[in-house]
Each structure stands twice: as structure tokens, then as C-alpha cells.
Amino acid sequence: MTPYTGLIDRYRQRLPVSGAVRIISLCEGNTPLIRLQNIPEVIERDVRLYVKYEGLNPTGSFKDRGMTVAVTKAVDEGSRAVICASTGNTSASAAAYAARAGIAAFVLIPEGKIALGKLAQAMVAGAIVLQIRGNFDAGMRLVKEVAARAPVTIVNSINPYRLQGQKTAAFEIIEALGRAPDFHCIPVGNAGNITAHWMGYKEFFRDGLAKTLPRMCGYQASGAAPFLRGHTVDDPETVATAIRIGHPQSWDPARQANKESQGWFDELSDEEILAAQKLLAEREGVFCEPASAASVGGALRDLASAKIPAGSLVVCTLTGHGLKDPDIAIRQSSARRVAVDATLAAVERAIMDNMV
């Protein structure tokens, strides 16, 4: 059996990477597509509901799919450094792939506004972390200005190679199911991922590898929902830090994906997002970060209203692992922590008192 070596090797003929380049990979991709068994019973709906668990990529998020291609191309073109603005996941991924490549990484993050797990990832991988007194959108503006003056390669999703890598998730979904889903539900922040998935679905459809295309359903947090407002949001705020973005860089292509697929954008409150995160963990054992849960929360609400009809095949993207932001999960958990004496009798009594 040939070992899996990463998505560039797996899909090289569909990616803008020539045969002679040095591939910068951490064996990203090939993430599980998990059928939810218990939640459909809880909501009492006839639905085939799956989650694409991108939190099992090397740095714990979907960003690795695009980063392997972006950093591979940067190194091939002679770049000695990469730069990004980030709400956390991009910085973690850029730092790891830059370390793998042996080049520098500069990451701009909003001071005090990203989860510590993500900050730790960037720091331990050796990135130069610049904490700016501003939000992601201010950081993105600065990254563009710096890249116009300094010899650094931007690895945010405005880098077209990022989306080329991220489209492979759609390939994997079709290969796992033997078809495209009826609906694909996905969290939306900077909007590169909904754009990339639509690219991937269209490519397989064009080449006869799928007979249908899904409707793309993008979900934003209410405090950071420019697609719902119809304009950018200057001061986005949400507990779902990964989608706390008011000026999406992929605005136009995401709108196009929405229109072409006859899908929709919708918004969820922070309370709805956290409830979906908790439901996934408690009922299915799948732990994702809050932003990821927006896809499931949105899908469940649309199933309840029959906007997504009964009998549908639905895939929800879980963009990042729950360990990215454990503090929020601990604060909202209903699990009891019981202090007991270190004796058999005390432990046995605690177990019997808490049996379901």
C-alpha cells in the first residue's frame, strides 16, 4: 500500500504545481467525512448529514490545504519569507509550513483577539508575530501595503494558490460519497473557502466525475455578517473568532458561488453557534471550534424550517479543531468535575451517583 503523502501528490494533475518543484507538505488533506448518527434522531429529521472534519489537518484547520500549495509556489519562485494577517488559523498554518520550508513567516494578528491555542501554534513554529492594535481587516490592509514594498509573499486567501489547494476538499467529498451532496453548508468569514469548494465541485462536474452540483449555503455570525448586511462591517464582533471578519477578501467570488449554486447566506447568533458546538461534542463526539459549528447550526435550522428538504444529502464543513479554542468550550460545558478522595470507596460512590 502506497503511503499518503499529501494533497499535492494526490491531486497534482489538478493543481498548478509542476513535477520538478520541491513540495512543502505536512501530509494535509485526506480528512474524514463523518456521518452524524445521533443528531438526525435528536432533531427528528430524515436527512443524511455528514461533517467534513478539517480540524484533523496537521495544524488543526482547513488552512493547511491552501498553505501547502501557496508555500510550495512561494519557495519555487524564490521567496524567502511569507506574510499574512490572521484571526488565528492562517497564522498557525503559515508558521508551520514556513518552518517546514526553512523560510521566515511574519504574521499580523489583532492584539488580544485570537484564541491562545492558535497564537501558541504560530509562536512555537518560530513565526515573527506582530500584534496590531486593530482588527483583522486592518491587518489585511497592512499586509497588502507591506508586500508591495518588501520581498515577502502574501499567503492569505487573496493568494490564488491558496484556493487551488482548498478546492481539493470538494474532490474528497465527491470521492467519499460517490456523488456531490445536495447541500454544502460552510462557515463564512473571509469567504475564500466557500469560493474554493465551489471551484472544486464545478471542476469535477465539468470532467464528468459528478453528475450534480450542490447548493452552497454560507453561514456567518450575526456580529460579523457583511454578506447579510449587503456591505462591509467595520467593527465585527463574535465569539467565533475565526470568522470575525468584516471586509471579506473573496467578496465577489463568494457572491458568484452563492448565485451560481442557487444557495444562500444566513446568520447565526453566538448562542446558536455555541449550542451547535456543544451538540456536536455531546451527541457525536466531534469537537470543533466555535466558527466551525456555524455550518451545523445553520444546517439544523434550515432542516427544521424545511428550507433544506427532508431526504437531502447534506455536508457541513468543520473548519477547525475544538482544541484551537478550549477556553470557550470549557466555559459552556455541562460536564461535572467532581473532587473526590483518592480511595476506592469515594471513586465508586461518585461513579454510582453520576451514572446515566
Where do the protein language model's features map onto the residues?
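PLP-dependent amino-acid enzyme catalytic core
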Residues: M1-V356
